[in-house]
Amino acid sequence: MRRRKFLSGSPNHIYQRSQNGSVIFYSLEDCLVYFTVFCTCAKRYGVTVLGLCEMYDHIHQLVEAPDLPTLSGFERMVNMTFSYEYYGDLKRGAEGFVSDRNITSGSVSVTIPNIGHLFQSPFGSAPKIGNKKIRTSIAYLYNNPVERNIHQEAIKWRWNFLAYAFS
């Protein structure tokens, strides 16, 4: 396995894809649970969050961690805790344990298989060195919903938290 690049004191662009390109966030609750787990783990691990964007099938983060073991531990805990909650919700269906669950969101009905890992492993990361690369990474992270044609305005996409960012 390749050694992960890391530079202490520099922001790292972290990207985490779903297994097989499947949807991660089906509901408002899924997004809020991930955000809660992410924020709780960031505080616990002493990770500074510069940006977060939850997409339907992947996640982008821009974070600063004091060292590589802290960053890896943080990502492991976020993914493990969210996966536990995600699959726990699937298993706590109306009939107890179910092998799959039909989730209805508005007029769209989707069946979620309850097999395997939720996220691809390992997570991807790229340290950002220098103001230009940091700014470019922030713009990429927050503009991802526009580039993927999910929303017309980045600031109005509720799951990139751009409306709550400050300079």
Regions found by a protein language model. Name each.
Residues 1-167:
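Short catalytic/metal-binding and nucleic-acid-binding patches
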